[in-house]
Design a protein with these regions (language model features):
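Acidic helix-start/capping segments at beta-turn-to-alpha-helix junctions
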Residues: 76-90
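A cross-taxonomic marker for long C-terminal extensions/tails that follow the last structured domain
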Residues: 91-156
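Solvent-exposed coil/turn segments that connect beta secondary-structure elements
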Residues: 51, 83-86, 116
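Sec/Tat signal peptide C-region and signal peptidase I cleavage site
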Residues: 21-25
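N-terminal secretory signal peptides
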Residues: 26-77
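Bacterial N-terminal signal peptides that target proteins for export
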Residues: 1-10
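Structural recognition of the beta-strand scaffold that forms the well-ordered cores
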Residues: 43-47, 79-82, 110-113
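Bacterial N-terminal signal peptides
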Residues: 9-19
Length: 156
């Protein structure tokens, strides 16, 4: 019970925090100076663990971020990390996802996929597109990127 209440409180704080960001962003196109330094790339890591809506929203978020950052002349580094059941939908046989992944890759997005998730979901690593790097753990990759200064973006 305590864990559920804690989760609900944390989620409420995040929702309230994000709702105020959009109002601020509308007033200040420089996002409070976040993008002021042109020499440092904007670093984003996105975690995707579910197929369907979360996967689609994460891809759209990356595309929109790239479009905005390029229009402002900003450098960026974006990595999408796949873990959990979504790995079943990232094999070479899923051509609809591969087209979108290749498009984002052409824009400089890098992809990582959890070896743990591949094993737990019965996916042969040989069936993963060559441009998606297999890593031991998706969760640990996200933690590493956060430590390296990346902003964590997750679609729910």
């Amino acid at each position: 019970m305590f864990k559920i209440n804690f989760f609900l409180i944390a989620a409420s704080i995040l929702i309230l925090g994000f709702s105020s960001v959009s109002a601020f962003a509308g007033q200040n196109s420089n996002y409070g100076g976040f993008y002021r330094n042109n020499n440092k790339p904007v670093k984003i890591v996105s975690g995707v663990n579910m197929p369907g809506q979360q996967l689609g929203i994460s891809m759209l978020n990356a595309e929109h971020a790239i479009r905005y950052l390029k229009s402002e002349g900003k450098k960026y580094s974006i990595q999408i990390v796949f873990y959990g059941p979504v790995v079943k939908f990232l094999t070479v046989s899923h051509t609809e996802h591969n087209r979108l992944l290749n498009f984002l890759r052409s824009k400089g997005v890098s992809f990582r996929i959890s070896g743990n998730a591949l094993m737990l979901n019965g996916v042969n690593p040989k069936n993963i597109p060559h441009f998606i790097k297999i890593i031991p753990s998706g969760t640990l990759q996200i933690f590493k990127k956060i430590k390296d200064g990346y902003t964590f973006l997750i679609a729910m």
